[in-house]
Every structure is written in C-alpha cells, then in structure tokens.
Amino acid sequence: MITLFLILCYFILIFNIIVPAISEKMRRERAAYVNYKRLNKNFICVDDRLFSYNFTTSGIKAKVAVDNKNVPIPCSEINEVNNNKDVDTLYCDKDRDDIPGFTRSCYRAYSDLFFTT
C-alpha cells in the first residue's frame, strides 16, 4: 500500500513540474508565431540591419536584407526595402565571416522574435 502511495506521489510531482513547463513553452511559441504573422513579410530593424523571417519545414528562419555586394542594408532604408519585394537576402543558418557581426545580429533577430515580452 505504501508503494502505491509513493508511486502516486511521484506521478503527481512529475506532472506538477512537467505540465507547467510545457504550457509555458507553448505560450512562448504561440507568442512568437503571432509576432511572426504580425510582421507580414516586412523587415524589422535589428543592430542597424534589416531582418525578416521565413517559415520553412524546419521552423522559422531569419534572413538579412543585403545589397548586390552582400553588404547588409541599414535601417534607414527600411521603407524602400519594404516597398521593394525583390530584395536579396542571406539566411542566418550559415556563418558569414565576410560580414562583421553577422552571427551576433542573427542571434539578436531570433531573440527579438521569440523573447519579446
């Protein structure tokens, strides 16, 4: 009888720890998806660079707007870039040594999407 009681207490303890963690993760993912949909394929300013997001089979990928020389476009040109749907972009899934601070800006773009409160 005591064994059954201990097993029951164990499951109650586990569910009290796991279920709130799962619901918090789901809440954050929903908030990130709402932020993604609110952007509506427009670019946002992160570290004086323009970023946008694509929803792919592997999840949400950040991409930075670049000119024809692969130099990130500054935030001062956000209106021109949002109006021009034919802008070149580089995805953040690969490291770029030719662009200083590229990885840090990509990390910040992801954190701005997922961890805004």
Curated annotation (Swiss-Prot):
Pfam families: Pox_A21. Residues 22-117 are virion surface. Contains two intramolecular disulfide bonds. They are created by the viral disulfide bond formation pathway, a poxvirus-specific pathway that operates on the cytoplasmic side of the MV membranes. The keyword Disulfide bond applies. It is found in: Virion membrane. GO terms for cellular component: membrane; viral envelope; virion membrane. InterPro entries: Poxvirus_A21. The chain crosses the membrane at residues 1-21. GO terms for biological process: membrane fusion involved in viral entry into host cell; symbiont entry into host cell. It is a single-pass type III membrane protein. Part of a stable entry-fusion complex (EFC) which is at least composed of proteins OPG143, OPG147, OPG155, OPG086, OPG094, OPG107, OPG104, and OPG099. Formation of the viral membrane is necessary for the assembly of the complex. This is Virion membrane protein OPG147. It comes from Variola virus (isolate Human/India/Ind3/1967) (VARV). The lineage of its organism: Viruses, Varidnaviria, Bamfordvirae, Nucleocytoviricota, Pokkesviricetes. The gene is OPG147.
